[in-house]
Each structure stands twice: as C-alpha cells, then as structure tokens.
C-alpha cells in the first residue's frame, strides 16, 4: 500500500511539472540594425564620441573664461602675540585674530575682448566632430563588408548544397545508365569524382559561412551572440548617381576635408594666440566682505581700540596691468613654432584634397565597373542554368558525354558564386564611396 502511494505521488509530481520554455527564436537583422548595434559596441567609435563630448566641454570652458567669475573665501588668521603690540608678531596682520570672509569677482578683459581662445576651442570641436563622422563612416564600411560577407557565405552555401544535389543526381543517372549498358564505367567514376569534389566544396562553404558569422558577431554583440540571421537585400542595391553629383557631395560632406580645414583654421588661431602673448594683460578683482579682528558686522580695531566699533563690511578693487618686457625670446620662439605648424596644416590640407579627388574617381569607377559586371553575370547565370538543363537531357539521351555534363555543373556553380561576389562587390564599392560623400 505504501509503495503504491509513493508511486502515485511520484507520477503526480511528474505530470504537474511545468513544461520547459522553448528557446527564443533567432533575431533577424537588416543592414541598418547591424550598423546601429555596431555603433553601440565599437571601441574606436565610442572613443570618437568621447573626444567630441570632451571638445564640447572645452568650448564651454573657453566661453566661461570670457565672463566674470565669482568665488567665495573664508579664512581665519591666528597670529602669536608679542605682549607689547596688539598686532602680534607678524607685521602683515593688525591683530592676533583676523577674520576674512568675502566674495571675489574676477574678470580677464583680454580674454573677453580678443576671443581667440574661444574661437580656437570652437575649431577643436569642429575637428572632433569631423573625426567622429570619419569614424562613423569607416565603421559603416567595415560592418557592411562583414554583413555581406555573411550574406554571400549563406548564398554560396546554398549554391554548394544545390551543386552537391546535382552531382548526386548525375551519379545516380550514370549508375543507372551503366546498368543498362548505355555508358561505360568511366562515366560512373567521373561522376563519383565530381560528387566527392562537391562534398568538399560544400564543407568549405559551410566553414566560410560560419567564419563570416563569427566576424559579424564580434562587431554586433557584446555577449558574442551567434544566434541571428541577416536579411538578403543584395537585389535592392542603391542606384549610382552621376559623377558630378558625387563630386558636389564630396566637396560639401567629406569629413576628412572638413577636419583638414578646421585644423588649418585652428593652426592660424594658434599663431594669433602666440602673438597675443606679447600684448599687455588687464585683469580686475573686486572683493566684497569683511577682513577684521572679529567675525562681526561691526568691531573694534585691535591696533586702535579707542576709536570704538567701526563697520567691517566693505570692498576693495585690484586692477592689474601686466606688460611683458623680456623673456629671452620665448614668446618669439612660440610664434615661430605655431607658424611652422600652420604651414604643415596647409600642406596636409592640400594633400587631403588631392587624395579625396583620387579616391573619389577611383571608387566611382570601381562602382561603375561592379554595376556593369552584375548585369553581365546575371545573364551568365541564366545561360549556365539553361546549359546544365540541356546537357542533362542530352546526357540521358546519349547525345552528350559525362565531361560535358560535369563541365556544365561546374560552370553553373562558378557563375552563381561570381554573381554573388559581383553583387557584394557593388555594395562594397558604394559603401566605400559613401565614406567620401555620405549617404545617397
């Protein structure tokens, strides 16, 4: 009875156990999704964002430096007495107890008038923004390459699977025809060799697809998730604008050119800043508060207590005019140093302009050639498919040799892979071109 009860309880527990949750379905990513994920994980891109934010803070600090600053100060000065004078042993103080509690307004008039430091910080922010855009476009090209490497890997894997099935079908046909005495045994051997070659090609295509998935997962997922798919949009490639339009976009939207121009402007401002070091500097400090022998609104002065209590609250103003006279040529050296950097920035701007024009023409021609190649390969795929179909029928009818059939199978596989590579080549050419022009 006890055994029956225990068995029943065990069966009840097994029945009421909750079912295991099904594994989550793998997510499917578009190229846009991949780009957004990569921007959240790429260290160099995040570093460029950090540099841009830091440059923005530099600009805020330079703007604040042109305005008056307000600080508060509270001190107690205790001086050892000498037993004779109420001022104590230090002549700088007028009593053994001194209390200071005031607010100080400071203004640098040269920074407010010249504005050179503020403008220099603005150019620094412009450089950082341009470098951020360079990083963004470079990351987009990298992700696009990895994305379509996986996509073409999947296509080639499917092509290899289809070629393997065709090789198996050809082997079966050869064996059947051999049994009927219609073809020699050499046809079966050739078909078997072709089938073995396609098996190896299938394994290689799977390895290439898995490797491409790993490469893309590194860019997209912090947890290195490999359970994802990609949307096949190779047939939706953007059209290629006219070269004149591309050239105009590059002139206005190229971040390398923007960074080089901003660097030249910054170098010119550095020369001005170096020269302005020879100008007089004018500052003012206005203090308002108390500096007395007692922490109070009114108190007696330790040096002359007979006068009674006097007001402690008041102000004093310090205006300073500093004239640089002699520094052993340091300021002149800094001017020459800044001028050398300005000339180098000018040289780099010229080199950047030439490089952009060279890359623009080269990448545009690459995109044009790739687009024409895609059109040609699309027709080749249709012809190769028809050739395989006809050679298969001719071989079964005894009108074609096994070599012709194997050659048709190999040609179709090669043309399909070439077509996939051609489509990816065009997409990558467009992505590289967009690093110069921006999206179009």
Task: Identify the role of each PLM range.
Residues 36-46, 53-69, 102-120, 130-137, ...:
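A glycine-/polar-enriched beta->alpha junction
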Residues 64, 197-224, 379-439:
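Short segments within alpha-helical structural elements
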Residues 16-26, 73-107, 231-243, 272, ...:
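Small/polar, glycine/serine/threonine/aspartate-rich low-complexity segments that form flexible
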Residues 35-39, 187, 192, 222-299, ...:
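Amphipathic alpha-helical coiled-coil scaffold segments and their short linker/junction regions
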Residues 138-252, 366, 370, 412, ...:
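Periplasmic alpha-helical coiled-coil/stalk elements that build and connect Gram-negative outer-membrane
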Residues 13-75, 81, 107-109, 224, ...:
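Bacterial Sec-pathway N-terminal export signals of envelope proteins
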Residues 1-9:
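Bacterial N-terminal signal peptides
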């Amino acid at each position: 009875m006890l055994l029956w009860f225990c068995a029943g309880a065990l069966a009840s527990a097994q029945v009421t156990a909750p079912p295991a949750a099904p594994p989550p379905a793998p997510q499917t990513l578009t190229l846009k999704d991949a780009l957004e994920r990569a921007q959240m994980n790429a260290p160099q891109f995040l570093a460029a964002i950090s540099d841009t934010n830091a440059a923005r803070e530099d600009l805020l600090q330079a703007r604040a430096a042109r305005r008056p600053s307000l600080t508060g100060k509270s001190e107690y000065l205790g001086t050892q007495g000498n037993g004779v004078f109420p001022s104590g042993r230090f002549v700088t103080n007028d009593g053994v107890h001194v209390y200071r509690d005031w607010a100080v307004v400071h203004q640098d008039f040269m920074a407010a008038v010249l504005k050179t430091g503020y403008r220099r910080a603005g150019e620094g922010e412009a450089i950082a923004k341009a470098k951020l855009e360079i990083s963004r476009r470079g990351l987009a090209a990298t992700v696009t390459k990895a994305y379509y490497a996986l996509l073409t890997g999947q296509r080639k894997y499917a092509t290899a699977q289809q070629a393997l099935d065709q090789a198996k079908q050809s082997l079966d046909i050869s064996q059947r025809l051999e049994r009927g005495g219609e073809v020699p045994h050499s046809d079966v051997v050739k078909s078997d060799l072709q089938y073995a070659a396609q098996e190896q090609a299938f394994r290689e295509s799977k390895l290439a697809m898995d490797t491409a998935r790993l490469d893309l997962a590194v860019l997209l997922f912090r947890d290195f998730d490999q359970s994802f798919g990609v949307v096949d949009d190779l047939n939706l490639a953007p059209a290629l604008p006219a070269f004149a339009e591309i050239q105009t976009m590059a002139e206005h939207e190229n971040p390398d050119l923007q960074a080089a121009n901003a660097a030249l402007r910054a170098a010119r401002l550095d020369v001005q800043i170096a020269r302005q070091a020879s100008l007089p500097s004018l500052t003012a400090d206005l203090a308002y508060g108390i500096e007395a022998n007692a922490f109070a609104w009114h108190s007696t002065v330790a040096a002359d207590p007979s006068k009674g209590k006097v007001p402690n609250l008041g102000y004093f103003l310090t205006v300073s005019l500093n004239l640089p006279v002699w520094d052993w040529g340091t300021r002149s050296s800094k001017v020459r140093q800044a001028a050398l950097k300005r000339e180098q920035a000018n040289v780099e701007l010229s080199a950047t302009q030439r490089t952009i024009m060279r890359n623009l023409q080269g990448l545009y021609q690459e995109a044009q050639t790739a687009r024409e190649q895609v059109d040609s390969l699309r027709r080749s795929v249709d012809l190769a498919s028809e050739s395989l179909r006809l050679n298969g029928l001719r071989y079964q009818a005894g009108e074609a040799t096994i070599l012709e059939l194997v050659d048709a199978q190999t040609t179709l596989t090669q043309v399909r892979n070439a077509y996939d590579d051609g489509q990816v080549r065009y997409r990558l050419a467009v992505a590289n071109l967009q690093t110069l022009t921006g999206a179009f």
